[in-house]
Amino acid sequence: MQRRQQQKEAPSNQNIMATILGSIPREAGVTKIEYEGPRIALYTNTPRYLLEHNEIISNLVNVIKKRIIVRIDESVRKKEEDARKMLSKLVPAEAKLQGTFFDTTTGEVSLEAKRPWLLQRNSAEFSHADVSEKIGWTLRIRKATTSQSSTMQVINRTLRASSIERGKQLKQIGDDIFRPKLATRSEISLTALGGFGQVGRSCMLLSTLDSKVLVDCGVNPGAAHPSESYPRLDWAGITLDDLDAVVIGHAHLDHTGFLPVLAKYGYRGPIYCTEPTLPMMNLIQLDAIKVATAQGRVPVYAERDVRQIMRQAITLPYGTVTDISPDIKLVLANAGHILGSALCHFHIGSGDHNFVYSGDIKFGKSILFEAASWNFPRVETLLIESTYGAKEDIQPTRQEVESAFINAVNGALADGGKVLIPIPAVGRAQEIMMVIDHYMKSGEMAEAPVFTEGMISEASAIHEAHPEYLARELKQKILETDDNPFDSEYFTNVEHADGRDEALRDGSPCIILATSGMLEGGPVLEYFKSIAPHKQNKILFVSYQVNGTLGRRVLDGARQVPLMNRGGKIEVVNIECRMEKLDGFSGHSDYNQLTGFVQKLRPKLRRVLVNHGERRKSENLALAVRRMFRIPAHYPQIQESIKLF
């Protein structure tokens, strides 16, 4: 008997509505049932009943195998201004409510509070059912950040302005997802369009007889020619209208940098990602426009294309099964790489095949994130990255690298020097901030002012707004106590060039975190000019320095470098300070962690594919998997198509 026949079948899409109507009691006050993208929305004019009898929805989900959400009917919603006034009285003062956002498309109101734990407990003092019944809006409790994220504010404004358009779009997406299957058999293939045999422009097409899903859509910023810079969508043999969905694993440009171009040329379908990935990728994509313009290049997309992505994005939490096409379900799981990074688990057909795309993963816990998830019920095919896939790619343990970091910083501060840390704004900067805060509080690192500049503050605000995606201990600190490391007394954000004077004042030891991580532009260069000529100072590199970058030249021993001053003239900077490079803070798994991840999945796997690495490293990891685990392993090349089932 085939696997699909063995599984308990859910009702057909035509019978779903009838099943729901037959299962909901009259007391629930359901006024209408609509598709809302990949979900089915039940609208009610008596929200308390379903909120207090949530087993009704749970039982329905088990029967129909679809996501169901409860929405409050528009007829009982209070006007926003009235609801806001009521909330100001209903929310306990000690929760420190900072702001509200009303999403008219979904009927949800987000409450941003300094002490969200006082609102999440659903206590007698603050009952969600009571409040929702009074104001006619469903509640979402959010952590209010120390400084507001301008990126998230722009997203909220964009969502409000496009509310009617989004509502229509979500209904159309639902119609497309829940359309009848046409194929009576399964054929599944994966086509490599970028990021195979290389790092950069990650992109692939997952195809069945019923569906076409694009997974990641990145760029290769270092490539000299467009044919090497962008995904080879011309090889996919499809139009943008053929796509059922785009799925994004994480926010970095090598995975999302070409996504605005899809919007520019007419893609209007759903874009699935985790909630923090949306603001993170918008931040990075908009910054890429600024960088291209500053370098005299014409950006391949405009700000309006990034805003269009905001309208099309459907954000998903970890661990939630979501229909994204008639025959593909998606589950996102923690990848441990950067904020919101996700492994993508595709359940295809009626149990025919399960495909997991690792994206960029860190299979090791850090102070910022939990280790990548691995406990999938079924995985027949795994596609795994190989950034550090060579046998010699072994990183020190976190304990070792944090100890080395403490010693490097303490030594420079003890000599009366300044420590400049060139750093990427997303991920690495927040991890170093958490390490500094932790060890200064414990007394293992000398206390000194810590200055940050660049996009670090904005990226940190996005981290702070999504504590549920952080390591367990850090999440608990932010959500359940007043001890918020992102609001540490040690940190000062430099918002304007005039603010650098305090950090650069003579005889004042300090730590400076500034972008960019490779000394290729950004405010770090202004600090570099002042810090490099003095022997007591130190430049501490904690991220990879690519060949040809200023960071690599400095690390390799350059003693003089020409830089442009504010007047537009070239000045020579003498380098007398000390240099140090620390490995181990990487957001990628090393060789041992990659093979360890495969080991965890070994009993379920039938095939391993390898991507996202230099060809030599991808080949080495594939050979290691075959040798160590006796599992077929292959490292595809761009334009190759692999039959999965």
From Swiss-Prot:
Residues 10-77 are annotated as: KHa. Residues 78-146 are annotated as: KHb. Coiled coil: none annotated. Residues 187-391 are annotated as: Metallo-beta-lactamase N-terminus. GO terms for biological process: DNA-templated transcription termination. It is an enzyme of class 3 (hydrolase). Its cofactor is Zn(2+). Binds 2 Zn(2+) ions, which are required for nuclease activity. Keywords: DNA-binding, Endonuclease, Exonuclease, Hydrolase, Metal-binding, Nuclease, RNA-binding, Transcription, Transcription regulation, Transcription termination, Zinc. PANTHER family: CLEAVAGE AND POLYADENYLATION SPECIFICITY FACTOR, CLEAVAGE AND POLYADENYLATION SPECIFICITY FACTOR FAMILY MEMBER. Terminates transcription on the whole genome. Termination is linked to FttA-mediated RNA cleavage and does not require NTP hydrolysis. Cleaves endonucleolytically at the RNA exit channel of RNA polymerase (RNAP); the 5'-3' exonuclease activity of this protein degrades the nascent RNA released from RNAP. Terminates transcription genome-wide in M.maripaludis. Restores wild-type growth to a strain of Methanococcus maripaludis depleted for this gene at 22 degrees Celsius and prevents transcriptional read-through. Transcription termination is most effective in vivo on RNAs with more than one U4-tract in their 3'-ends. Has endonuclease activity after U-rich tracts in transcription termination sequences. Belongs to the metallo-beta-lactamase superfamily. RNA-metabolizing metallo-beta-lactamase-like family. FttA subfamily. This is Transcription termination factor FttA. It comes from Cenarchaeum symbiosum (strain A). The lineage of its organism: Archaea, Nitrososphaerota, Candidatus Cenarchaeales, Candidatus Cenarchaeaceae, Candidatus Cenarchaeum. The gene is fttA.
